């Protein structure tokens, strides 16, 4: 793998997450009915950071949750082409709430579809929205993000690597040539 470009550094990532937080507040006219649900692995710390920014802006906490989808992603591995939803999902009650799924990269749409299915098994939300740090295209399902940090058109021979403090050493988004 060869590094092709650094797309976001730590400061650019913080600005991007701040913009997404503002867009979420604006589109939903506040945060009263919102539940942010991070898709494990890197969607969880991204959701936590967006929640912290929203709290700074609004002065109150947004409800947070997570969904654990074990995925042998088709852009990282060929072990399985389908995401596997574990029965360990932990999140707020979603009935009649606006659930905002948060993930690091939107690619084929399969992870998002599995997360939506997991949410629907837990209750019937008023609405489900999607926030992603990076949208790289190449959808295999009719999935579109409501909040996008950065659109990064890629070829299938490229890989987007999102690094998040807490899991990784730094905040950054890089593109690699395979």
UniProtKB/Swiss-Prot annotation:
Q: Which NCBIfam families match?
A: PRK05205.1-4, PRK05205.1-5
Key words, A-Z: Glycosyltransferase, RNA-binding, Transcription, Transcription regulation, Transcription termination, Transferase
- What CDD domains does this protein map onto? PRTases_typeI (cd06223)
Q: Which GO terms describe its biological process?
A: DNA-templated transcription termination
> Which species does the entry assign this protein to?
Clostridium acetobutylicum (strain ATCC 824 / DSM 792 / JCM 1419 / IAM 19013 / LMG 5710 / NBRC 13948 / NRRL B-527 / VKM B-1787 / 2291 / W)
Signal peptide location in the record?
Answer: none
State the name under which the record lists this protein.
Bifunctional protein PyrR
Q: Give the binding site residues for substrate.
A: 41-42, 103-111, 136
Q: Which SUPFAM superfamilies match?
A: PRTase-like
Q: Where is this motif: PRPP-binding?
A: 99-111
What role is this protein assigned? Regulates transcriptional attenuation of the pyrimidine nucleotide (pyr) operon by binding in a uridine-dependent manner to specific sites on pyr mRNA. This disrupts an antiterminator hairpin in the RNA and favors formation of a downstream transcription terminator, leading to a reduced expression of downstream genes. Also displays a weak uracil phosphoribosyltransferase activity which is not physiologically significant.
> Its quaternary structure?
Homodimer and homohexamer; in equilibrium.
Q: Which gene encodes it?
A: pyrR
Q: Does the keyword Lyase apply?
A: no
């Amino acid at each position: 793998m060869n590094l092709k470009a650094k797309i976001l550094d730590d400061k650019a990532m913080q600005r991007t997450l701040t913009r997404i937080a503002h867009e979420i507040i604006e589109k939903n006219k506040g945060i009263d009915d919102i539940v942010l649900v991070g898709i494990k692995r890197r969607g969880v710390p991204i959701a936590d950071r967006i929640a912290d920014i929203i709290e700074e802006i609004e002065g109150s906490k947004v409800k947070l949750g997570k969904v654990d989808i074990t995925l042998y992603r088709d852009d990282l591995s060929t072990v399985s082409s389908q995401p596997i939803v574990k029965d360990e999902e932990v999140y707020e009650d979603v009935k009649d709430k606006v659930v905002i799924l948060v993930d690091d990269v939107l690619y084929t749409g399969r992870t998002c579809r599995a997360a939506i299915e997991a949410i629907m098994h837990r209750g019937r939300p008023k609405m489900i929205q999607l926030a992603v740090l990076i949208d790289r295209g190449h959808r295999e399902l009719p999935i579109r993000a409501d909040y996008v940090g950065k659109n990064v058109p890629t070829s299938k021979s490229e890989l987007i690597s999102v690094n998040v403090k807490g899991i990784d050493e730094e905040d950054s988004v890089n593109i690699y040539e395979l």
